[in-house]
C-alpha cells in the first residue's frame, strides 16, 4: 500500500493541515496523564516546522457527543505540545468558522495553530461534506498522521480528502503501514501470531486472515475456553461463548487443513473469582473445577509459548493472555512480553497490535524493547483483518 508521505511534498510557506491523534487521557483536574500520542506525532510536526511550513493541527479528544464540552477541550494539549516543541501553540476557539479562518491565514512560517476538538461538531463523525469542505479550506496541503482513527470514515480523515488536491500520510502512519504491511505481505519466517483477549467473535476475522500468512498461532485469553468447551472439556465458570463452539471447531479444522499450527494452552491459572484477593493456582486444562474460572495461561503454557516466540523471525501480538490488570493474573501476559523482548534482542521483528497488548507491554516496562507498538487498537485490528482503512485509502498514492 504505497502512499505519498510528508517527504514527497514541498512545505515551505504552505499552510499544512494535519490530522493527528491527540486523544490523550486526562485526570479529574484536566491534566494529561500520558502524553505518548502527542510525542508520537512529533516527527511529522517537526518536519513541517523545520521546513518552514505553517502548521494547523486538528484532533478529537474523548466523546463529547457533538456538543461543546469544556472537559474535552484540547487546551491542555496545546500547553503540553508547546513544551515539547519549545514553540508557542496558538489555541483556536473552534475548528471551523470565520475567526479560525483568520487565524489560519495569519500564520507565519514555522507557527502552529491547534484547532479545538473536532467532535464538538456532530458533523465530524457523520462525515458531513460541508463540514469537510470548511476544514479543508483552512489548509493548502492535508496530512493524515492519525493511525488510531484511520479505520473511521470521518470528516477529518476521509471527507476532507475530496476537497484537497494534496493528501499525504504523516510519518506515524507511514511507520504503521511499513511494519503491519510487511508482516502481512512479506514476513520473515517463522511467523508466529499470538492472539489473546476474551472473545473469539472479536478476533474471528483476524484469525481467518492470518491463517493464510502465519506459520503458528498461539492462543490465550478467555477465548481459549470456547475452544475447550467445543472439545468437551470442563470450563467451570470461565467466560465461554456458547454460540461460538461450532466456529471454534471450524477454526481448528481450518488451521489443520492450511498447515498452520494452532496451539492452545495445556494449563491455566484457576481462581474462584476475578478479584485481586482471590486464591489462584495452576491446573491442567482438563482439571478445571466447576466452581473455578480460568484467569491466565499457566506456567507450562507460558514456557511453551516462550520457546515458540524465541524460535520466530516475525511475531505479531494482539490481546493479553489473561486478566492482566490484576497482578496475580498477569503472569502469562508478562511472560509473553518478556519473550518478545528477548526475541527482539535476537533480531526478530516484533509487532504489538495496540490496545490491551500495548498496555501490557508498558506494564511490564518493556515498551522500548519491541520493534513496533501500533498506536491504533481498532485500526490495527481492522488492518490485520485485511480490511481497507478509509483514512488511508483516501490519501494520494
From Swiss-Prot:
Which SUPFAM superfamilies did the record assign?
Phosphoglycerate kinase
- Give the matching CDD domains: Phosphoglycerate_kinase (cd00318)
| GO CC field | cytosol
The pathway entry for this protein reads as: Carbohydrate degradation; glycolysis; pyruvate from D-glyceraldehyde 3-phosphate: step 2/5
Q: What keywords are annotated for this sequence in UniProt?
A: ATP-binding, Cytoplasm, Glycolysis, Kinase, Nucleotide-binding, Transferase
Q: Which residues form a coiled coil?
A: none
A GO term for molecular function: ATP binding
EC number from the UniProt entry: 2.7.2.3
Specify the enzyme's EC class, one word.
transferase
Which family is annotated? Belongs to the phosphoglycerate kinase family.
Positions bound to substrate: 21-23, 37, 60-63, 119, 152
Q: Show the PROSITE patterns listed in the entry.
A: PGLYCERATE_KINASE (PS00111)
Q: Give binding positions for ATP.
A: 203, 294, 325, 354-357
Where is this protein found? Cytoplasm
- InterPro entries listed in its UniProt record: Phosphoglycerate_kinase, Phosphoglycerate_kinase_CS, Phosphoglycerate_kinase_N, Phosphoglycerate_kinase_sf
What GO biological process, any one, is recorded here?
A: gluconeogenesis
Quote the PANTHER family the UniProt record gives: PHOSPHOGLYCERATE KINASE, PHOSPHOGLYCERATE KINASE 1, CHLOROPLASTIC-RELATED
- Broad class of where this protein is predominantly found: cytoplasm
Q: What chemistry does it catalyse, as a reaction equation?
A: (2R)-3-phosphoglycerate + ATP = (2R)-3-phospho-glyceroyl phosphate + ADP
Q: How does it assemble?
A: Monomer.
Protein's UniProt name: Phosphoglycerate kinase
Q: Does the keyword Flavoprotein apply?
A: no
Amino acid at each position: 500500500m504505497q502512499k505519498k508521505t510528508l517527504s514527497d511534498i514541498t512545505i515551505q510557506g504552505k499552510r499544512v493541515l494535519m490530522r493527528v491523534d491527540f486523544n490523550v487521557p486526562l485526570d479529574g483536574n484536566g491534566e494529561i496523564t500520558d502524553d505518548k500520542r502527542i510525542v508520537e506525532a512529533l516527527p511529522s510536526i517537526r518536519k513541517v516546522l523545520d521546513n518552514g511550513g505553517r502548521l494547523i493541527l486538528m484532533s478529537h479528544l474523548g466523546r463529547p457527543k457533538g456538543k461543546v464540552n469544556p472537559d474535552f477541550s484540547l487546551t491542555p494539549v496545546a500547553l503540553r505540545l508547546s513544551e515539547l516543541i519549545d514553540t508557542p501553540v496558538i489555541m483556536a476557539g473552534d475548528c471551523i468558522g470565520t475567526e479560525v479562518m483568520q487565524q489560519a491565514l495569519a500564520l507565519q512560517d514555522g507557527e502552529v495553530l491547534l484547532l479545538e476538538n473536532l467532535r464538538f461538531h456532530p458533523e465530524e463523525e457523520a462525515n458531513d461534506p460541508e463540514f469537510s469542505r470548511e476544514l479543508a479550506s483552512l489548509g493548502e496541503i492535508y496530512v493524515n498522521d492519525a493511525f488510531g482513527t484511520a479505520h473511521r470514515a470521518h470528516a477529518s480523515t476521509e471527507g476532507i480528502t475530496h476537497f484537497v488536491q494534496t493528501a499525504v500520510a504523516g510519518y506515524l502512519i507511514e511507520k504503521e503501514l511499513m511494519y503491519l504491511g510487511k508482516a502481512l505481505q512479506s514476513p520473515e519466517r517463522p511467523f508466529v501470531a499470538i492472539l489473546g483477549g476474551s472473545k473469539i467473535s472479536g478476533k474471528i476475522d483476524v484469525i481467518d486472515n492470518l491463517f493464510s500468512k502465519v506459520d503458528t498461532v498461539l492462543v490465550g485469553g478467555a477465548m481459549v475456553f470456547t475452544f475447550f468447551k467445543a472439545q468437551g472439556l470442563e470450563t467451570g465458570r470461565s467466560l465461554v461463548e456458547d454460540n461460538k463452539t461450532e466456529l471454534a471447531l471450524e477454526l481448528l479444522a481450518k488451521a489443520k487443513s492450511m498447515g498452520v499450527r494452532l496451539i492452545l494452552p495445556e494449563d491455566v491459572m484457576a481462581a474462584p473469582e476475578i478479584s485481586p484477593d482471590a486464591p489462584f493456582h495452576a491446573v491442567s486444562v482438563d482439571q478445571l473445577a466447576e466452581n473455578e474460572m480460568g484467569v491466565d495461561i499457566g506456567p507450562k503454557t507460558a514456557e511453551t509459548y516462550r520457546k515458540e516466540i524465541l524460535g520466530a523471525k516475525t511475531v505479531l501480538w494482539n490481546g493479553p493472555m489473561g486478566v492482566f490488570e490484576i497482578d496475580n493474573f498477569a503472569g502469562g501476559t508478562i511472560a509473553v512480553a518478556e519473550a518478545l523482548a528477548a526475541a527482539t534482542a535476537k533480531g526478530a521483528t516484533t509487532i504489538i497490535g495496540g490496545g490491551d497488548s500495548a498496555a501490557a507491554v508498558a506494564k511490564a516496562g518493556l515498551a522500548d524493547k519491541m520493534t513496533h507498538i501500533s498506536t491504533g487498537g481498532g485500526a490495527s485490528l481492522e488492518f490485520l483483518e485485511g480490511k481497507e482503512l478509509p483514512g488511508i485509502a483516501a490519501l494520494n498514492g
